[in-house]
């Protein structure tokens, strides 16, 4: 009970208590018992003015002396239901005691798949929990457009409820596509440069591949990026990307190596390592997923990469607002091929050379965990979103390698064809807040923090797993990967041959974004934004002075073109601002954001001064020119 002896009496507690009791009774046979079955709360204060005795009175149904407790009778399943057709056209088929009504001569969905999602049984006491689980489980199969469960009273026995399950088939095949575009316009020391990217991603879905409600999704990705500033030169084509991915979902929980069953039986203090409630959620709601992907990127004149990926895991919709994605097994093979121009960059940037080579990511028990939670708008117009991602690779290989070395008394590192196994852990948290003041005025904010760390035999986190900032969906005053790490200044990115090729990344990321969004007229909307953040390295990097995340200033050595010191992280926060325009066509949004740097992560004046003033970090607007603006074009909102 929500009432506690000695606690203050509140009226709202009575409503909660009525709902609690009604829910409990509906799950114990009383199918039609609701909170309105109670009379007004009766409080007796005759014994004391400061204490009261509460009485809850149950009102019987009209014309009855008590509420009826029900058992379940016949269960009939219309697996190909059509409300426009009479019952007479359906064929009867009995499977495991359940009566199926079919329009077609064969089952479109295997009956056992349907029965696995039905948690009601003839002869059982009616349970609202079992009713809700069945409704939710059948809906989650994805092969039914509509799911309805009716309860009909028996004509001869008032204590029996017959169950009628109506399943309307969904379309088996579905085609769709996504279009993504981005545009970045900015300056380097060589003058203005502009990159335009366009990507097309068609998708084909089969909702019942093997007649067991399996969902197969095949996606193709094709993208190209061009440099308009080099229109009549060989440098016009910047990059090409091609990708193919296939995901196969099974509508059941496949316990990988019986790990979850074992953890459910393993004691953990006074409880279990995996609770019965969590194990039940996995069995009821988890869809098992097999995924394979190939991705190819060719950056003209610089490098090309090929990525192969395969994984196995689960997709678990906890409720309408919460989803968990868990991968047990993950295998990635990354193979880069560099051109002489990029080899020059690698020679000048050992950090990039160490993290850009061939990579093999292998996880056998745990690869990735992703938790996303949506917060629906409240009465104040506030809503939100949270996402936590944890990724790890190589732990099992490293442990096995270390165990072998201990027994063999050696220091060998396991490799395949000269390719090292990467060991790293990566954590990222993203939280967003939205506030709607009026239908034409709103506020949006995002905070993002990420941390990546190599362990085992790896010294650096793979380049593709490191963090970066800048670009249309990040700190819009800088190009993607053109900011940081820390106060480091990348002179190579300002070289005469650079085609807006930025590659600066870090092990730690802090980022904050805020937008005031408003309606202009018709389909045109506007925004004023503020972005702040940076990326850092966790360890000192002799090749990127000023890049380390520190709490206090430390002097640097051998940094002729950079700062003679490494500032604390809060002095290296870059700040940008700007305004944007959005054309809202409901199904997609064209966005143009004009970003301007406000504060740099290092002094831009008096560079070699060991005690620069705060003003030395800020942009000088006395000589403001159009070249100071970064033009960012994209589809959809940045967050």
Tell me what each language-model feature is.
Residues 4-7, 107, 127-387, 476-477, ...:
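Gram-negative/organellar outer-membrane beta-barrel architecture
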Residues 469-472, 476-477, 542-639:
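C-terminal beta-signal and terminal closure region of outer-membrane beta-barrel proteins
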């Amino acid at each position: 009970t929500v009432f506690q002896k000695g606690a203050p009496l509140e009226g709202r507690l009575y409503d909660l208590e009525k709902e609690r009791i009604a829910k409990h009774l509906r799950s114990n046979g009383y199918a039609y018992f609701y909170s309105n079955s109670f009379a007004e709360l009766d409080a007796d204060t005759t014994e004391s003015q400061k204490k009261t005795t509460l009485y809850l009175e149950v009102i019987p149904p009209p014309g009855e002396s008590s509420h009826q407790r029900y058992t379940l009778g016949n269960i009939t399943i219309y697996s190909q239901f059509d409300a426009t057709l009479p019952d007479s056209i359906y064929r009867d088929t009995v499977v495991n005691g359940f009566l199926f009504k079919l329009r077609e001569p064969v089952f479109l969905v295997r009956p056992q798949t349907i029965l696995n999602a039905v948690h009601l049984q003839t002869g059982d006491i009616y349970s609202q929990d079992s009713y809700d689980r069945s409704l939710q489980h059948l809906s989650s199969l994805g092969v039914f457009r509509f799911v309805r469960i009716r309860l009909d009273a028996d004509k001869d026995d008032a204590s029996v409820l017959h169950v009628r399950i109506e399943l309307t088939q969904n379309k088996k095949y579905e085609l769709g596509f996504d279009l993504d575009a981005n545009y970045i316009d900015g300056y380097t020391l060589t003058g203005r440069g502009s990159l335009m990217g366009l990507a097309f991603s068609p998708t084909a879905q089969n909702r019942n591949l093997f007649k067991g409600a399996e969902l197969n999704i095949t996606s193709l990705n094709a993208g190209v990026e061009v440099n308009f500033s080099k229109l009549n030169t060989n440098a016009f084509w910047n990059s090409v990307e091609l990708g193919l991915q296939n995901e196969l979902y099974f509508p059941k929980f496949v316990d990988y190596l019986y790990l979850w069953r074992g953890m459910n039986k393993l004691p953990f203090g006074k409880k279990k390592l995996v609770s019965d409630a969590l194990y039940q959620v996995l069995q009821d709601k988890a869809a098992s997923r097999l995924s394979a992907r190939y991705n190819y990127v060719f950056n003209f004149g610089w490098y090309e990469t090929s990525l192969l990926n395969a994984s196995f895991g689960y997709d678990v919709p906890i409720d309408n607002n919460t989803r968990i994605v868990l991968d047990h097994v993950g295998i990635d093979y990354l193979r880069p091929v560099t051109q002489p121009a990029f080899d020059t960059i690698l020679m000048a940037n050992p950090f990039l050379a160490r993290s850009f080579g061939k990579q093999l990511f292998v996880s056998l028990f745990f690869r990735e965990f992703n938790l996303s939670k949506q917060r629906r708008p409240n009465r104040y117009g506030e809503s939100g979103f949270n996402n936590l991602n944890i990724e790890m690779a190589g732990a099992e290989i490293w442990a096995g390698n270390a165990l072998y070395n201990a027994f063999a008394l050696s220091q060998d590192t396991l490799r395949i064809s000269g390719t090292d196994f990467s060991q790293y852990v990566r954590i990222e948290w993203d939280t967003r807040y939205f506030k709607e003041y009026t239908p034409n005025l709103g506020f949006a904010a995002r905070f993002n923090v990420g941390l990546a760390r190599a362990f085992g035999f790896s010294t650096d986190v793979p380049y593709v797993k490191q963090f970066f900032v800048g670009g249309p969906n990040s700190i819009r005053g800088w190009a993607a990967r053109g900011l940081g790490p820390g106060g480091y200044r990348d002179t190579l990115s300002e070289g005469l041959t650079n085609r807006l090729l930025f590659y600066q990344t870090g092990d730690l990321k802090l980022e904050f974004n805020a937008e005031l969004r408003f309606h202009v007229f018709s389909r045109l909307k506007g925004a004023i934004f503020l972005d702040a953040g940076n990326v850092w390295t966790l360890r000192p990097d002799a090749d990127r002075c000023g890049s380390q995340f520190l709490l206090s200033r430390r002097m640097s050595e051998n940094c002729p073109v950079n700062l003679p010191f490494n500032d604390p992280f809060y002095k290296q926060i870059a700040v940008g601002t700007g305004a944007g325009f959005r054309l809202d066509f409901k199904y997609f949004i064209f966005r143009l954001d004009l970003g301007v740097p406000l504060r740099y992560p290092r002094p831009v004046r008096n560079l070699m001064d060991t005690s620069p003033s705060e003003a030395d970090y800020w942009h000088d607007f006395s000589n403001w020119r159009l070249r100071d603006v970064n033009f960012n074009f994209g589809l959809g909102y940045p967050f």
